[in-house]
Amino acid sequence: MADLISYDDAIDAAYDIFLEMAPDNLEPVDVILFTAQFDDRGAAELVDISDDWAGHVGFDVDKESYAEVRIGLVNEENDVLDDVFARMLISRDPDQKFCHILWKRD
């Protein structure tokens, strides 16, 4: 197995993918909200990989080789990322590129 990319690089890659795909996968109002408030409240953060990913991607997720990144807006009152626009599972193996996104749905 190749050396895994760092968690910081995984977050950066996830954010780049999110920006590219968000206009086609989010409601226009959510894209406007995210864009307008990202500087003050936006976040892309690494979280523990949820156990439900196997059901979404069809394989058991190796928690060392993958990262889960959540992208959204932080609640200013409690500093919690509670308005999640995308949950992303991204491979940290540069030879096995993979990304799966669960988009916010109203």
From Swiss-Prot:
InterPro entries given in the database record: dsDNA_mimic_put, Put_dsDNA_mimic_sf
Functional description taken from the UniProt entry: May act as a double-stranded DNA (dsDNA) mimic. Probably regulates the activity of a dsDNA-binding protein.
SUPFAM superfamilies listed in its UniProt record: Putative dsDNA mimic
Lineage: Bacteria, Pseudomonadati, Pseudomonadota, Gammaproteobacteria, Vibrionales
Taxonomic superkingdom: Bacteria
Family the UniProt entry places it in: Belongs to the putative dsDNA mimic protein family.
Name this polypeptide is given: Putative double-stranded DNA mimic protein VV1228
